[in-house]
Amino acid sequence: MDLRPELPTASSASQVHPGAAAAAAAASIPVSMAGNLLRGPPLLLRAADKYPRTPKCARCRNHGVVSALKGHKRYCRWKDCMCAKCTLIAERQRVMAAQVALRRQQAQEENEARELQLLYGTAEGLALAAANGIIPPRPNYEVFGSVNNETNSDSSIPKYELFSKSQLSGSATPQQSVGKPASTESDSAPGISSPEGRHGGSGSENGDSESFISSPVSKPIKDGEETPGSVSSLGSDSGSETDKDDQEPSPSSAASRHMNAIDILTRVFPSHKRSVQELVLQGCGKDVVRAIEQILNNSGAQGPNKTGPEETWTAERMLQNAQQLPQSSASTTTPTRPMLPGAMTLSNRSAFSPLQPNAPHFGADPSTYPLGTPLGLNPLRLAYSAHSRGLAFMTPYSTTGLMPTLGFRPPMDYAFSDLIRDRTMLHKEQGYASGLYGPLVNNTPDKQ
């Protein structure tokens, strides 16, 4: 039958089919290798997809246990462990928390400063707003104020002495510092108070006066110890003859206050006699501020050219200005000693009264003490001028008022409202105050 030839064909077909399958498999090998190279190891991909990285507990890791941190902090078995590694972890956590808090505070301060700049402009705008009272000034030295309120006047804060201890070593008993608030007769002039008012004072009005009174107290010092008080606040040597004439205060309070006022005058004006200063103080009603102003006005009335020994200070002139006591003929000679900075520009007014811009004493005698800028602006007028008078572009105390030995051009004799006047209205014969910095031509000061 025809069944035999069909069987070989079927067997042959069955024999050919594995070869074709092998050929097809061989043909598909390069494609699978290329796919494996492009895909990378599938085992790592499956591990990354199945096990994402989660934060682990550091304390458990220190003890060889891996545990997820989520919901584990409260139930950690080593949460109270005090070993070295766990203690280091706690310290790191504390440091990181402090850093985060500091960064938050800095960011908050920067935001506040940025808001203030948007509201008021730059730093100059902030200063102008604070000067006009728009922004309340921040209280300074509150720590020292609270300490001084709790303790007595003799605090343990280190203080600096402005006066030489060797000149005061001859006194038998030290002078006790005034504990009660000082009255107006013990108020000292600005610029002569010691730094004790800033370091140990409570910031009140009588802090500077009390510290000035208690500063010349003689205290026992060690041999060879240098004190910062070898130079007085006036910039001159404190070892003058009048410094040795200090007397001990009487037991009564009024006499002690009077002696304190006399001591202040002798410290401020060491070149004047004590008797003359007592007369001036009595003529001014025992007001130290008025007495200092009277002495300064009399010194300014004589002119700056008389600096030799022939210049005399008369108590008659001082008492005549005080207008309360009869004239006296006591006179002294003044050595060449630098006076207070800006002293010759003061007037008969009190130092605490507002200055009038068009007052006659501003331009009365510009040759008395030429402390002015080349623009002719008076330093005191700049210091006490209001911002509403067209000087908002200048900050208060912008000029130099602490340079009594340098020669400046004399101020112009007009007020701020007359700034358009010609500069030729100056005194033609006025020269420089000193030949140290002024140009000299044949020993003659250069004319303006």
Swiss-Prot record:
Residues 166-187 have a biased composition (Polar residues). Residues 166-259 are annotated as: Disordered. GO terms for biological process: germ cell development; sex differentiation. InterPro entries: DM_DNA-bd (IPR001275), DM_DNA-bd_sf (IPR036407), DMA (IPR005173), DMRT (IPR026607), DMRT5_1_DMB_dom (IPR046472), UBA-like_sf (IPR009060). One of its GO terms (molecular function) is DNA-binding transcription factor activity, RNA polymerase II-specific. Keywords: DNA-binding, Metal-binding, Nucleus, Zinc. The keyword Calcium does not apply. Residues 57-104 bind DNA. It holds the Pfam family DMRT5_DMB. SMART domains: DM (SM00301). Residues 259-294 form the DMA domain. GO terms for cellular component: nucleus. Residues 229-239 have a biased composition (Low complexity). It is found in: Nucleus. SUPFAM superfamilies: Cysteine-rich DNA binding domain, (DM domain), UBA-like. May be involved in sexual development. Belongs to the DMRT family. PANTHER family: DOUBLESEX AND MAB-3 RELATED TRANSCRIPTION FACTOR DMRT, DOUBLESEX- AND MAB-3-RELATED TRANSCRIPTION FACTOR A2. This is Doublesex- and mab-3-related transcription factor A2. The gene is dmrta2.
